[in-house]
C-alpha cells in the first residue's frame, strides 16, 4: 500500500499513471530500482536490493556503506503480455516538475531531520534486518506463486506499475502509524505463507518430478508434437517453406531483442558502478554521517503475501518519527549546501534512469507486439495445415489407403495431462507448460477471436482460453476434417475430373512448349543462321509444299470424277460398234448437251428402196435432226401416258420395259446411259445391248397375235382398221403421195400401246434383217404400199394384205427400237 497524498504546490492531485523515477526528499540517496527486463538469461545483476543505497551506520561506528544485495523475486514468464504500461513523456515531465516543487518544501524540514539522525539510525538498522529477512522469504515464496483469475492479475499488475511519488515531507503521524500497522500485517501474512509453502514444498517437488519424467518420455517418443502424413512431395515442400519462413522471422526478432537487452544490461551495470563510486567519494569527503546519509531505510515494500506477485519493487522512504523538539533546531548552512549538490547529482541520475526505463518499456512493448504476431502466425499455420490436410483427403478419396492420422496421436492424452496440470497449478509452479498456460490465461485477448472462430473450426464446442494451445487447435482441425469429410466425398468425382483435365492440359502445354523450344529456341539460345533458316522455310518452302499438295488433291478428284463418268458400252461385240460407241461416249457431255447429228454413211441403204421411198422419207425426216427427235419423243410420250389401259398382252411388257428404262427404278441405269443408248439406236439402228428383251418381245408378239379375222371381228379393229384401211385405200389417185404421207404420220402419232398389243397381223414371224431408221423404214414401206393402191374392188384384198404387212413392220420396228 502506498500513501497517495496531494502536494500543496500543485493544484489538485496527480494521476497514478507513471512510476517514480526518483524520490525527492532530504535523503535523496534513496531511489527506486527499475523493473526487470524480459531476458532469457534471467539476470540477477539488473536490480538493486532494498531499492537503492542503504543508510549508513551510526556516526560513532564509522562503518562503510552496506553493499547492495541483488534481488531476484520470481521466474520471468515466457509470454508476459501487458505487464507494463508505456510511460508518456508528458507524465515523466510532470513527475519531474512535481519533484522539483517538493524540493523547496523539503528544504524547510532539513533541521528537523538532522536533529533526529541518531534516533532514526537504530530504527533503520532494525528495518534493514527485517527487509533482508523479507527478501529471503520472498525469494522462496514467489517461486511457488500461482495464477488466479484475469481480473485479479490485472489489478496486481496495475498496483505494481501504476504508482506515483509519495510526498514524504507532508505525511502526517497518523498516516505513518497506519502504514506501520499495514506493514506488520503484511509481515504476518508472509510468515504464514512461508510456513505453508515449506509444508507443501516436498509434495510439490515429488509431483513435479513425476510430471517431468512423463513429459520426458513423451518428448522422446514424439519429438515433432504432431505427425502429419503428406501424400505428395509438393505438399511437403509447402509445409517446409512456411515453417522455414516463420523460423527466419522468429530468429531475427529474437536476436534483435537479445542484443538490445544485452546493451541495456551493460548500461545499467555501468550506472551501478558509477553510483557506488560516487557514494564512496561522498562518504570519504564528509568524514561523518551527514543528515542526508542518515536516512531511515525502513524499505516500504508492496504486499509480499500476494500470490500473483511476479516482481517485488522496494520503494525506500523516510519514516519521519520526529518529536516536537526537533522542529526547533535550525539546519546548518554547510550541510544545506551539500544537500543541494547531492540533489542536483541525483536529479541527473534520475534523468539517466528514466531513459533506461523508457528503453526497457520499449523492449517490453516490442515483446508484446511480437507475441501478438506470433499468435497470428500460429493461426495462419493452423489454417495452412487445415487446407493441406483437406486437399490430401480430397485427392486420396473417401477411403484412402494412407490417411492423415491425427486422431490416433497421443496429443489427446497430452491435452488430458495438460488439463490435469491446469487443475494442479498450485503444486506445479516449475513446469514450463504450466507457465505457458498461466500466461495464456492472463493474455487470452489475442486468442479470443481465434478460439471462437466458428467458421474456421466449424464446431459448436468453444475452446476455453485456459486449455487453448497448438494441440487443441490441431484437435479442432481434426474434428472439422471428420465433420466435413462426408460433404467433401460428394464433390470428389468432380474434383478428380477437374484435376485430370488440368493435368492433361498442363502435359499438352509442356509438350508444345518443349517442341517450340527445340525448333526455335529461346531468345538467349537462338542464332542468326537459325533465324535465316526459319524465315526461308516460312517464305519459300512452305508455299511450294502447299502448291504441290493442292495440285495433287485436284488430280485425285479429277481422276475419281472421270472414273465415274466412263461410258457404258452398249451393242454387239464387233469392232465397229465398239469404236463408234467409245467415240460417242468420249464426245458426250451432261444431259443438256447437244445431240450428235448422224451421218448419211451410218444409215445402211435398203435394196428395195426406190425414188418414191426416198422422196417420202424426205417428207417424214427433214434435214434438221430436231424434227426427227421431236417425232420420236411424241411416240415415247404417248407410250408412257397410255400404258395403263390394257392389262394383258404385249402392252404390259412394253409398258414395264418402257417405265423401267425411262424411270431407272429397276434396272439401275442412269439418265446419261439411257440417252447414250437412245442416240446409238437412232444413229446405228441398233436396239441396244438388251437383246433378250427384244427377242422376248417379238416371241410374245408372235404368240399373242392372231389371224386377221379375229382382229377384224374384235372391238378394237374398227378403231384402227377404219383409220388404216380407209385412209390407205382411197379412190383418188391424183393425191396419193401427199395423202399417203399425211396418213402415215397420223397413224404413227395415233398408235397406242393398247392398240398395238392386240394387233394379230399375219407374217409376224418374219423379221426384217435390216435395222434401219424406224421412221424412214416405216414411211418407205407404208408409202410403197399406199402408192400401189388398186383401182378396182377385185384388188382390195391384196392391198389390204400389203397394208397389213407394212403395219407389221411398223410395230416390229417400234418394239425393237423402243
Swiss-Prot record:
Superkingdom as given in the UniProt entry: Eukaryota
Keyword Methyltransferase carried by entry: no
Q: Which keywords are on file for this protein?
A: Membrane, Transmembrane, Transmembrane helix
Gene Ontology cellular component annotations, sorted alphabetically: membrane
Bias kind Low complexity: ranges: 1-33, 44-68, 97-150, 284-302, 784-803
Amino acid composition bias (Acidic residues), ranges on this chain: 172-190, 205-214
Its principal location?
Answer: membrane
Q: Where in the cell is it found?
A: Membrane
InterPro entries hit by this protein: Glucose_repression_reg (IPR052292)
Question: What is the membrane topology here?
Answer: Single-pass membrane protein
- What residues form the membrane-spanning segments? 534-554
Q: Where is this region: Disordered?
A: 1-68, 92-150, 164-220, 284-306, 415-445, 779-808
In Swiss-Prot or TrEMBL terms, this protein is called Putative uncharacterized protein DDB_G0280071
Annotated source species: Dictyostelium discoideum
